[in-house]
Amino acid sequence: MEGSPVTSVRLSSVVPASVVGENKPRQLTPMDLAMKLHYVRAVYFFKGARDFTVADVKNTMFTLQSLLQSYHHVSGRIRMSDNDNDTSAAAIPYIRCNDSGIRVVEANVEEFTVEKWLELDDRSIDHRFLVYDHVLGPDLTFSPLVFLQITQFKCGGLCIGLSWAHILGDVFSASTFMKTLGQLVSGHAPTKPVYPKTPELTSHARNDGEAISIEKIDSVGEYWLLTNKCKMGRHIFNFSLNHIDSLMAKYTTRDQPFSEVDILYALIWKSLLNIRGETNTNVITICDRKKSSTCWNEDLVISVVEKNDEMVGISELAALIAGEKREENGAIKRMIEQDKGSSDFFTYGANLTFVNLDEIDMYELEINGGKPDFVNYTIHGVGDKGVVLVFPKQNFARIVSVVMPEEDLAKLKEEVTNMII
């Protein structure tokens, strides 16, 4: 799909119902800064036959003030602070909780019903057209951290699209925000999110050495977007339950009881080793999450896995993933703190990066008892080595979403198809 089918785009701002931020600063942690150039994007599709109308959702969206009471930092704006009174050091960004609000976008798609849209093979169109294309900057002091887009389709269906600056929190944090939105739209008191005050490293965190899970680059200034050397593409693989059962039977044994996520990681890793060669894909990054209800980036667990042997199969790669992960949270924190804001860093795509979304219920957004028919998450602002998101298992399939250079993507589709036949 070349041209945008979206019409009648209208933007407005929504601010908290009362003063909650009090202009207080919210400091960004090193883990926030490791995610500074990344954005979480999501779409929630609702087909036409529902107990609520698009007008109901739109009208309630303008009472988002109640939601922003709990998420006051989401309504803030980026500011720059002096670095420990060191005039030679760069300024450090933080969030000024000044109740400036979020953006709400209303739009229409008149050519499609939701059902016809979801029948299209290319799922990259979800985030191209149904999520507002927002990044922070170049006017940082005026850039909203969150955009919500409500798109009405023909015959009553709708899509709610989210663009979420990753400095606010990970995919779990964004999903919790949307769940709370659903509670508000349904007339329920929203659950207040949990934001701890002091990050704590796990006992096995490594503080020694340089982190290889993130990449250091020159400062991007006030336009917070990673520049790619090649054109990036998106694709969704739908692994049926039969595919999953076949892969598990083929590559796991009683002595090697790998998880489905381990096998899917290994399958994609092996495919890209075949495509890119040994030297470019010997190291992968894995993003897990602590079992926690907190909404922030500090609960991310960033690990690396290194492959040393030249000829390695899927079972051997799965064994490395299951048993040889090396956590780097401590090293990441130390690197970013020592840099003192003079450079920028990125995580997704610094190496081939895998993100485990298994613990996230993407379908928690519920409006008047109705859950979405399809949910699609992705990461925007990904480095050239790509990112792979493994979605939670659904009734009929497990989705694996990838963002890769287009040249690799075409070959990856063929490799994966050959491996699951």
UniProtKB/Swiss-Prot annotation:
GO terms for biological process: cell wall organization; pollen development; very long-chain fatty acid biosynthetic process; wax biosynthetic process. One of its GO terms (cellular component) is endoplasmic reticulum. The modification N-acetylmethionine is found at M1. Disruption phenotype: Bright green and glossy stems and siliques due to low abundance of cuticular wax. Increased levels of C26 and C28 alcohols and disappearance of C29 alkane and C30 alcohol in the stem wax. The keyword Nucleus applies. Its main location: endoplasmic reticulum. Pfam families: Transferase (PF02458). Expressed at high levels in the epidermis of stems and young siliques. Expressed in flowers. Keywords: Acetylation, Cell wall biogenesis/degradation, Endoplasmic reticulum, Nucleus. Coiled coil: none annotated. Signal peptide: none annotated. It is found in: Endoplasmic reticulum; Nucleus. Belongs to the plant acyltransferase family. Involved in biosynthesis of the epicuticular wax. Plays a role in very-long-chain fatty acid (VLCFA) biosynthesis and is required for C28 fatty acid elongation in stem. Despite its classification as a BAHD acyltransferase based on sequence homology, CER2 does not seem to share the catalytic mechanism of the members of the BAHD family. This is Protein ECERIFERUM 2. The gene is CER2.
